[in-house]
Amino acid sequence: MDAPLTLIGSGMAALGLVRQLRERDARRPITLITADSGDDYSKPLLSTGFAKRLPPERLAARSALEVADQLGVVMRPHTRVTAIDPAARRLSIGAEILPYGELVIATGAAPRVPFAIPEAVATRVFTINDLDDYRGFYAALEALGRPARVTIIGAGLVGCEFANDLSAGGHRVSLVAPETTPLPRLLPEPLGRALGNAFADAGIDVNLGRQLEALAAEGSQVAVHLDDGQALEADLVLVATGLAPRTALAAAAGLAVSDAGIRVDRQLRSSQPGIYALGDVACVAGVNAMYVQPLQASAKALAATLAGTPTEVSYGAWPILVKTPLLPCVALPPHRPLARWRLEGEGADLAALAEDEDGRLIGFALTGACVRRKVELARAAPALLV
C-alpha cells in the first residue's frame, strides 16, 4: 500500500484541504495527526462564544471521530510529531516511525507571550487560540459562579474581539496595551480612538499607553501591575499579545523558514520535495495572511495541486472584518508603501483611505456606518497576491 498523504494539524486549514481533496478523490489514504482534540470547529467563533455563554461542545460541529468517519481519514488526536525526515519521507512520533507519501504542515500559529508568568498565578492566566484553550477559560469562568473581572493584555485583533465579547457576556473587562489606540496594525489613530471610546462607553476599563510590569498573586486574585503605578485586580488574565507561526518542527527538518512562517511558493511547496505548508504557519511568496479567506484559497489551490493539477494560489483584496459589535470595524491594511491616510466621515462613522504617492487606493479602514463601503472599496483596491 502506498504511504498516505499526511497532514500535521486539524484546524480550518487542514480540514478545508481534506474536504477539497475528497471532492476530487474519495479513496486516497489520508492521515491527520494533531496535538489537540481534532474536533471540527470554526476558529473565528472562539471570540464570540462568551457573550452567549456557549459551552465548548456547542462550538464543535463534529468530534474527531465524526470527522474521521465523514472524511474517510485516519485521525490521531492529542499526538505530537517529534521529527520529520524529508529524505526518507518519514515522521517520528516519539519512538514510532510513520512513512508518508506527501506531507502538509498545517500547525498554525502559537500565542506569543512576551513575559514570564509567575507560577503562583499560572492557573489564572490564559491564552485562547484553539478549542481546548476555550474549554479551559470557559471552565475557569464557570467555576467563579459570578461575573468575572478579566484583564486582557493586548489590544490587537484577538484582544479587542475578546474584550467586546466578554463585556457583552456581563464580565468586567480591563484592556491593557502599550499602544495608544486599539488595533494599531489595522486602524489609523482616529479610527482606533473611536473604537477605544466605544469600549470605554460600554464600561470596559481601557488602559492604553501602559506597559505591564508584573503579575502577582493576591489571595484568590491576580494583581496586574502597570508602569503608571496602577494595580488592576483580576480574577483571570487573558494574554493576547500576538501569534507566532509554529515553525520549529519544520526548521529542525531543514525546511526554509522565517519569522513569518514556513517559506513556500504559490503552489504551497516548501524547500523540501513532497512537503507543503498551509494556513497560519505558511508564508506564501513572502506573504502570511492569517485570515480565513487566504486560508480557504490556499486549501483549494493545494488540493488541486495534490490531485495532479499544479495550481498557484492568488489572494484578492479581502478586507478583515473585526468582531467588535460595540463599533463595527473593517480593514484592508496596505501592503504597498503608504504615502498618506485620507480621512472621511465624522464621529465614530469614519473611513480612512490609504493612498500611495500617486493618490491610488492601496487599502482602507472603516468604522461604524462606514463599514457598508467595504465591498465598493475592496473592488478598487489592489489584490494581495496575484
Task: Give the ranges of each region predicted by the language model.
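Mid-to-C-terminal Rossmann-like scaffold of FAD/NAD(P)H-dependent oxidoreductases
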Residues: 2-4, 10, 23, 281-374
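Beta1-alpha1 glycine-rich phosphate/pyrophosphate-binding loop at the start
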Residues: 2-73, 165-186
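Short hydrophobic core segments
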Residues: 8, 98-110, 232-242, 299
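Rossmann-like dinucleotide-binding cores of NAD(P)H-dependent redox enzymes
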Residues: 60, 149, 157-214, 295, ...
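A conserved beta-strand/loop element that lines the FAD pocket in flavoprotein oxidoreductases
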Residues: 70-85, 202-212
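Glycine-rich dinucleotide-binding loop and its adjacent helix/turn
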Residues: 107-169
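FAD-site-proximal beta/loop scaffold in flavoenzymes
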Residues: 121-146, 223-225, 231-297, 301-304
